[in-house]
Amino acid sequence: MSTMALWRSTFIVSAMTMLSRVLGLVRDVVLLNVFGAGKDFDTFVVAFRIPNFFRRLFAEGAFSQAFIPVLTEYKAGRAHAEVQILISRVFGCLLTVMTLLTFVAMVLAPAIIYMYAPGFHNDPEKFDLAVSMFRLTIPYLMFMSLTAFASSILNSYGSFASPAFSPVLLNVAMIAGAWWLTPYMAEPIKALGWSVVAAGILQLAVQIPELWRKNLLIPPKVDFKHEGVERILKLMLPALFGVSVTQINLLLNTIWASFMQDGSVSWLYSAERMTELPLGLIGVAIGTVILPSLSARHAEQDQEKFRGMIDWAAKVIVLVGLPASIALFMLSTPIIQALFQRGEFDLHDTQMTALALQCMSAGVISFMLIKVFAPGFYAQQDTKTPVRVGLMSVAANAILNVVFIGFFKLIHWQAEHMALALASSGSALVNAGLLYFYLHKRNIFRFGSHWKKLILQYGLANLAMIAALWFGLNWYNGELSQWIRIAEVAGLCVVGVIAYLIGLLVSGFRPRDLKH
C-alpha cells in the first residue's frame, strides 16, 4: 500500500472504531447507571471477560496473526481456487475446534470461574451467579471466532469497513438489553448475557454479504492435514501466548482484584475502557491495516518498504498516543465524573476509577506501540520472538503486582487496585521495549536520525497541551449537572487539541513529515 492507501484504510477502521468506542462509552454509562459498580456487575465483568479473552487469544489474536500472512502468501502466488480451498479447510477446522471448546467450557464453568476469580468463592451467591453468567455468555466465543475468521479474510483483500463495524453491534445489543430486557428478567444482570450472545450472531451475519460478493463464502470442510492448515497451526501454537499477553495480564489482574474490596473489578474495568478509546482508534486500527501490507511486502522481499511501513506507523502512534496518555492522566477525574457518575455510580466510585485510570494512562503509548512492533514479526511468520517477549512481560506484570500491592499494604493505602493498574502499565513498557530491541537487533526496524527532530517537535506540542489543560482545569466544576460536566470535558478536550496542533505548527512539524 502507498501512504495514501494506508491513511485511507486507517481512516476507515478508525472511523468505525470511533463509532464503536462512542457507543461503548454510552454502553458503559447505561450499564453502570442500571447496575452500579457492585457485586452483580462484578460477576458479569468476570464472566464476559473470559470468553472475550479466549476470543482475542484464539480468534483475533493468534489465529489472525497466523492466518493473514499465510492467506496473503496464497493470494500472491497461487490460483484463486487454491485460496478457496484453504479458506474452506480453515473454516471447517476452526468451527470444529470452537464448538468443542465451547462445550468443554460450559461443563467446566465452576472450575474456570474459580481459576479466574478465586476470591468469588468466598461468597457462594456471587460465585454461583458468575458461573451462571459464564455459561450464558460462552457461546459468544464461537460466533466471534467465526467473525474474526471472516474479518481476517476481508482485511487480506483490502476490505476493512464491515469487520471494523461489527463491534458496534455488541454495544447496541448490550444497551438494548440493559434498557429493555432487564425489566423482564428474574435476575436483571442476565439480560446482558443474552444480549452478548445475540450480538455474536449479528456480528457474524454482517460479514457474510461482503464475503459473498468476493466469491469467498466457501462451505466448511475439516482437513487438519491440509498444508495451509498445518502451517497456520504451527504458527498459532506460539502465537497463542505471544499475541495475547495483554489479555493474560488483564486476567491475572482480575484474579488479584477478586480478593480486593467489592467494586475493584468494576473500577479497573471502567478505567480500562477509557484507555481503549485511543488504543482502538489508532493502535488497533493501524495494527489491523499494516499486517496485510507488511505480509505482502515480506512476500515480495521488499525490506525497504517493510521498514518504511513500520516507521510510518510508529510516527502516527507517537503523534497521537503520547498526548492521549497525558490527557487521560490530567483529565481522569473530570472524564469519569462526566461519563459515569450518576445513578448507582457515586463519587467514591469516580475517585477509585480515576486513580486506576491515572495509573493505566501511563501505559497507553506502550500498548499502542506493541500493536505496531508485533506485526513486524508476525508478517515474517516469526511467532517465537513475541512469545519470548510475552513471557518476560507476564513475569514483569506478576512481579510488579506483588511489589506494588505489598507497598500499598505497607503504607495502609485503601485503593489497592491502583497496584494492578500500575503493574499493567509497567509490563506494557517491558513488552514494547523488548519488541523494539529485537527489531533493532535483527535489522528489521530502528528509529532513524529523523526521529530526534520529531521527538523535539512532539515534546514541545505536548508541553503546550499540558499548559492549556492545566489552565482549563482551574475552571472545571464537578458539582454541576452531568450534561454540563460533559460539556466542560468536551471543551477541555477541544482546548487541548487546539493547543497541541498549534504547538506542532510552531515547532515546524508538517503532515509530510509522516510519509514513509
Predicted regions located by residue number:
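Membrane-embedded alpha-helical bundles of multi-pass transporters/translocases
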Residues: 1-516
